[in-house]
Curated annotation (Swiss-Prot):
Its EC number is 3.1.-.-. GO terms for biological process: DNA repair; DNA replication, removal of RNA primer. Its cofactor is Mg(2+). This is Flap endonuclease 1. It comes from Pyrobaculum neutrophilum (strain DSM 2338 / JCM 9278 / NBRC 100436 / V24Sta). Pfam families: XPG_I (PF00867), XPG_N (PF00752). Coiled coil: none annotated.
């Protein structure tokens, strides 16, 4: 999901840069699809194509998930990945629109290959990111072999992750998007699944994890509660109404909510006559009461070393030497977390 325009309203006073080590001992509910798409977009070969095994199956998402999760665990973080389930009915039209955009980009890739334009191939390949059911199941298998818990959400993954954070079972949601705040997560941690260095145009910039707290956002924007933040997001555009209200930018959206108090009042006044492809009040109700499950286990399990090697090296042609070294790192990180948990138990920390 993605409420990109909302991020423009969230200033530095509501953000706090941190180091991975600052999250040691914390359980972070990571938006699995968001992370996998990040890996698919960033882990590419020079020609723009993703990493693949000998059978032509994409492995960029597995490489990113494997090595980045180990980095998080070495920092003492307890990750749990939450996978999307069935999307709400009113999101299906947007999903179809995205599919058409990707198909158009693929046509441009084929054209660029035919014309020998390598730069164009790389450019358009980054727009052709498909996450298939097989790729998702492989990601779950990888996490299981690593002993890392994952949760299957009944609907939106960020809604489930936010629910777990609200209940205090996880400290925060990890995602690049801000939707978890709309779903009620007390905290959002961004930049966990991305490389510490990211290319911005021609420059390589340092990227640090940052914490965004819901209460700090509401205070900074002078909003009375999460419902008003949802109202602002709907005016700007969400995954369910990506175009938002024509002519309404971040500052105007905030001004309207502060002036009228609620989306309901605006629909009867200033927004009367505005056409919405999806009932905005239905979107609001979904953010406030999304489908979630209480059936999840967040405990880290033992590493299945043989399963990992067979899966990554045997099935997907990863380097045996690199995987062996990474598995040792994973086992050491897991052992340190167990020791830390025992120390906390016996010393009441």
């Amino acid at each position: 999901m993605g409420v990109t325009e909302l991020g423009k309203l969230i200033g530095r006073e509501a953000r706090r840069e941190i180091k991975l080590e600052n999250l040691a001992g914390r359980c972070i509910a990571l938006d699995a699809y968001n992370a996998l798409y990040q890996f698919l977009a960033s882990i590419r070969q020079p020609d723009g194509t993703p990493l693949m095994d000998r059978q032509g199956r994409v492995t960029s998402h597995l490489s990113g998930l494997f090595y980045r999760t180990i980095n998080l665990m070495e920092a003492g973080i307890k990750p749990v990945y939450v996978f999307d389930g069935k999307p709400p009915e009113f999101k299906l039209a947007e999903i179809e629109a995205r599919r058409r955009v990707k198909e158009k980009a693929m046509e441009e890739v084929v054209k660029a290959i035919r014309e020998g334009k390598r730069d164009d191939v790389a450019k358009y390949m980054k727009r052709v990111i498909f996450l298939t059911n097989e790729m998702v199941e492989d990601a779950k298998r990888l996490l299981t072999y690593m002993g890392v818990p994952w949760v299957q959400a009944p609907s939106e993954g960020e809604a489930q992750a936010a629910h777990m954070a609200k209940r205090g079972h996880c400290w925060a949601v990890g995602s690049q998007d801000y939707d978890s705040l709309l779903f009620g997560s007390p905290r959002l941690v961004r930049n966990l699944a991305v490389s510490p260095k990211r290319r911005s145009g021609e420059e390589v910039v340092e990227v640090s994890p940052e914490v965004v707290e819901l209460d700090s956002v509401l205070k900074a924007l002078k909003l009375k509660g999460r419902e008003q933040l949802i109202d602002v997001a709907i005016l700007l555009g969400t995954d369910y109404n990506p175009d938002g209200v024509p002519g309404v930018g971040p500052q105007k959206a905030l001004k309207l909510v502060l002036e009228f108090g609620s989306l309901e009042k605006m629909l009867d006044t200033v927004l009367r006559g505005v056409s919405f492809p999806v009932d905005p009040l239905e979107i609001k109700r979904f953010f406030l009461n999304p489908p979630v499950t209480e059936e999840y286990a967040l405990e880290l399990k033992n590493v299945d070393e043989r399963g990992l090697v067979n899966f990554l090296v045997g099935e997907h042609d990863f380097s045996e030497e690199r995987v062996a070294k990474a598995v040792e790192r994973l086992k050491k990180a897991r052992a340190r977390q167990k020791t830390s948990s025992l120390d906390s138990f016996f010393h009441g920390a």
